[in-house]
Amino acid sequence: MMYRTVGFGTRSRNLKPWMIAVLIVLSLTVVAVTIGLLVHFLVFDQKKEYYHGSFKILDPQINNNFGQSNTYQLKDLRETTENLVDEIFIDSAWKKNYIKNQVVRLTPEEDGVKVDVIMVFQFPSTEQRAVREKKIQSILNQKIRNLRALPINASSVQVNAMSSSTGELTVQASCGKRVVPLNVNRIASGVIAPKAAWPWQASLQYDNIHQCGATLISNTWLVTAAHCFQKYKNPHQWTVSFGTKINPPLMKRNVRRFIIHEKYRSAAREYDIAVVQVSSRVTFSDDIRQICLPEASASFQPNLTVHITGFGALYYGGESQNDLREARVKIISDDVCKQPQVYGNDIKPGMFCAGYMEGIYDACRGDSGGPLVTRDLKDTWYLIGIVSWGDNCGQKDKPGVYTQVTYYRNWIASKTGI
């Protein structure tokens, strides 16, 4: 017996050319939209994610010399660790997702130093963070076991996901970082500083009138020049404003107290340094951040390019400016600065000169107490000088004289704990 399947009769239908064209266009459109959505979700719909990592560097010598001028400087250890984490993820399968890392804390422990680092990645928002958290820890564990640069205990590695707001605030609270690229242009004279370019710059004001510059070194402390308080000594009439304009200020704080160096004497101009504590904590943002302080043992060579900022006058006898200005100058050697036609014996220990011997760019009235800064290879900025004194502004053979921060580093620490 043969089985016969039931068949349905068919009739051929010829599609017209225009209908075929429409179908092709529709098909291509669907494919293009699908690919576009896929690209959008895989490439463009990616969000920054922050992860807190910690591990221990096992070396008692680091702990013993922590903070001292020895083989392991804090700055070097921080840079070495950040470079190490960079290399680990750039050499991993997640190199396209990795953005950066930042060491936010180094804590001495009995057998070494605990490192806390914030790692920033970019992933599609659809993926599970818990899975990535474990993967990041796994990558760190595997790579660290084969490292020779630092004796890290691989079993001490811990990784935890952070909320975007907490991660960003933690990164912002780290010193010496800015979001605006360095302006390569070259206050007597200088140029107006872009918004958020120098987020540690502050204006010290007496009865709401600008008197001096100051530099933010924590969320409650600033560094400035002692001579700023020579005339007005009541802290309750002083305020500090932040931002690139004096009016309107981005943020304002009352002064709780200021501490002038005990050995400061106006006639000699030595020990021209003071610290200022504000009455309430400063809220960090892209526009307001703290700068790093160098170690006491750090040295900065003549001819190094540095940057000065301030609201001071544009010429000798002029008035302070509402807009923050910036200028690029160079450190001048003591040998040159102590020449008779320059400043001779007026240059004492704890002072240095910066600017140009031909004049041009210089600090001026109203810039006093403000910052002279430089950056390292990791683009971290350090306060190395405080605007102190000089003859006129931008005059030939009369560069600006600055208080040397490294000379007073231990004094700053003794007063502020920073």
From Swiss-Prot:
Enzyme Commission number(s): 3.4.21.-
Q: Which Pfam families match?
A: SEA, Trypsin
Intervals, Cytoplasmic compartment = 1-18
Q: Where in this chain does the entry annotate a coiled-coil region?
A: none
* Catalytic residues (UniProt): H227, D272, S368
Q: What enzyme category does the UniProt record give?
A: hydrolase
Q: What are the protein's GO molecular function terms? A: serine-type endopeptidase activity
Q: Which residues are glycosylated?
A: N153, N303
- What protein does this entry describe? Transmembrane protease serine 11A
Can you name the source organism?
A: Homo sapiens
What gene, per UniProt, encodes this protein? TMPRSS11A
